[in-house]
């Protein structure tokens, strides 16, 4: 992903493309709700007009709308809870290495 971001123009490289775990949960739930409602509405529109194309266009339009909402990492939706990483621990010698150093002396 970093390689793809490096190919973008300089102003776009400054934009963050990461979302947190809570943001992923919100994005997934939003995606499910919108597409489920769109499927029901698309079915009803297609049934009422007896046109399968109207049902398909309704669902495709809702899919495009969902992509517009979900794909950008909006800071007010998907980046409210930043991840705090632990600092890396110092490497410690294992018990086997300590025994080997004692034997060589």
Swiss-Prot record:
Residues 54-56 are lumenal. The gene is spcs-1. Belongs to the SPCS1 family. The lineage of its organism: Eukaryota, Metazoa, Ecdysozoa, Nematoda, Chromadorea. Residues 1-32, 78-105 are cytoplasmic. One of its GO terms (biological process) is signal peptide processing. Component of the signal peptidase complex (SPC) composed of a catalytic subunit sec-11 and three accessory subunits spcs-1, spcs-2 and spcs-3. The complex induces a local thinning of the ER membrane which is used to measure the length of the signal peptide (SP) h-region of protein substrates. This ensures the selectivity of the complex towards h-regions shorter than 18-20 amino acids. This is Signal peptidase complex subunit 1. It is found in: Endoplasmic reticulum membrane. It comes from the Eukaryota. The chain crosses the membrane at residues 33-53, 57-77. It is a multi-pass membrane protein. One of its GO terms (cellular component) is signal peptidase complex.
